[in-house]
């Protein structure tokens, strides 16, 4: 208030709404944010009632204070600000940004403990590489965090791919139950 600028005050609290990538994107558009952290027992309820704009939680577990959640919040918001990352489009491909988990990453060497980098990734065929990445992203999300798919923008091809995964998974489960 002293500067005359409006400040959005966030209190890091296990009682707040769970932080999501959607909320991070929204917060990245707010010019002035201050983060309030409690320690052990939290902060005075009157402060929350009178000056806190929003309570945010980073998950359902106990920490000694709000400092680590505040760092998580600050880091996730800063990644959305143009110029923070070397490639401003890089964050759009990462897990959670578009309600999908990120595709698998591979580095050198080509062969590590008998496991090789998928051939499509070294083929140089960019269209096939993009298709592979999209399908692996869909597959990972389907297998590990299917709850996220409801928020994803899916093309007709994506839906067909996921239907194929459902059928494959259903068939595998049937085969296992017959053993």
Locate each region found by the language model.
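Short gly/pro-enriched beta-turn/loop segments at secondary-structure junctions
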Residues: 4-5, 29-30, 51, 56, ...
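S-adenosyl-L-methionine/SAH cofactor-binding core of RNA-modifying enzymes
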Residues: 1-39, 82
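Long, charged alpha-helical interface segments
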Residues: 96-151
């Amino acid at each position: 208030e002293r500067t005359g600028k409006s400040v959005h005050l966030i209190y890091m609290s296990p009682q707040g709404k769970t932080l999501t990538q959607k909320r991070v994107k929204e917060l990245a558009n707010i010019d002035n944010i201050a983060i309030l952290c409690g320690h052990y027992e939290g902060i005075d309820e009157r402060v929350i009632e009178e000056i806190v704009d929003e309570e945010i939680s980073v998950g359902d577990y106990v920490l000694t204070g709000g400092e680590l959640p505040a760092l998580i919040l600050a880091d996730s918001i800063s990644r959305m600000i143009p110029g923070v990352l070397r490639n401003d489009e890089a964050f759009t491909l990462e897990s959670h940004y578009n309600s999908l988990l990120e595709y698998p990453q591979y580095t050198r060497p080509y062969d590590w403990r008998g496991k090789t980098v998928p051939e499509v990734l070294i083929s140089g065929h960019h269209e096939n590489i993009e298709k592979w990445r999209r399908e692996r992203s869909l597959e990972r999300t389907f297998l590990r965090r299917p709850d996220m798919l409801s928020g994803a923008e899916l093309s007709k091809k994506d839906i067909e791919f996921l239907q194929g995964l459902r059928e494959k998974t259903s068939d595998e489960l049937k085969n296992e139950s017959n053993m």
